[in-house]
């Protein structure tokens, strides 16, 4: 039985070598799928620590990006043991960067952290046309739609997208995120909530599907 506390701490401390050593040793013991899910849960707990430290100002954006990459690596090591991916999905999220905005670092961090928390994420990429958001939302009927943006112009794009989604009868929860996003912007867009912090954004999504 692996020591999950050590794994959680290693992820929280961003100790890549330690994380990989623990996981490779664990996989070598030919674990069951249920045990592998415990390993994923320990990694997720470590990601929550990273999110908290980021909120406290101990970690920076670069650390969050690294943590997301570390988590992807960890999940890849465990994939052969996790079987067909029958792990319970926390919920489904459709994300993309607002039309006219080409920034994706924040969105990518959010995607990594949401996937780590057990969400199934469909990422439409950057500069996503309003019609694309609407068509995909109608096709996959996600629990949550997330629109990110760094430029001030993204707010108007978010509003146009939000209006189009509502007009199309899409009733997914809508969260918007990025530097220019404020409570006022959230009300203007007609979103259910907003965040400027990927870790906090994931917590909001967890509360919605919890």
Curated annotation (Swiss-Prot):
Taxonomic lineage from the root: Bacteria, Bacillati, Bacillota, Clostridia, Eubacteriales
Keyword Metal-binding recorded: yes
Cited Gene3D superfamilies: Cobalamin-binding domain, Methionine synthase domain
Ranges of residues in domain B12-binding N-terminal: 1-90
Pfam families membership: B12-binding, B12-binding_2
Protein name: Quaternary-amine-specific corrinoid protein
Gene Ontology MF terms: cobalamin binding; metal ion binding; methionine synthase activity
Biological role stated in the UniProt entry: Involved in the degradation of the quaternary amines L-proline betaine and L-carnitine. Component of a corrinoid-dependent methyltransferase system that transfers a methyl group from L-proline betaine or L-carnitine to tetrahydrofolate (THF), forming methyl-THF, a key intermediate in the Wood-Ljungdahl acetogenesis pathway. Acts as a methyl group carrier between MtpB or MtcB, and MtqA. A methyl group from L-proline betaine or L-carnitine is first transferred to the corrinoid prosthetic group of MtqC by MtpB or MtcB, respectively, and then transferred from MtqC to THF by MtqA.
């Amino acid at each position: 039985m692996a020591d999950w506390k050590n794994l959680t701490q290693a992820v929280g401390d961003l100790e890549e070598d330690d994380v990989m050593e623990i996981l490779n040793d664990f996989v070598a013991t030919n674990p069951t799928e249920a045990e592998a899910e415990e390993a994923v849960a320990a990694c997720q707990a470590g990601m929550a620590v990273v999110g908290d430290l980021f909120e406290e100002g101990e970690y920076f954006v670069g650390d969050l990006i690294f943590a997301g990459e570390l988590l992807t690596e960890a999940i890849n090591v465990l994939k052969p043991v996790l079987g067909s991916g029958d792990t319970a999905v926390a919920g489904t999220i459709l994300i993309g960067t607002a039309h006219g905005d080409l920034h994706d670092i924040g969105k990518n961090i959010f995607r990594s952290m949401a996937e780590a928390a057990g969400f199934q994420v469909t990422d439409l990429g950057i500069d996503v046309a309003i019609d694309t958001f609407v068509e995909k939302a109608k096709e996959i009927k996600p629990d949550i739609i997330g629109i990110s943006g760094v430029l001030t112009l993204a707010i108007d794009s978010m509003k146009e997208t939000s209006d189009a989604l509502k007009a199309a009868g899409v009733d997914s929860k809508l969260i918007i995120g990025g530097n220019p996003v404020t409570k006022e912007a959230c009300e203007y867009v007609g979103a259910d909530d907003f965040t400027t912090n990927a870790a906090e954004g994931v917590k909001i999504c967890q509360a919605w599907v919890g």
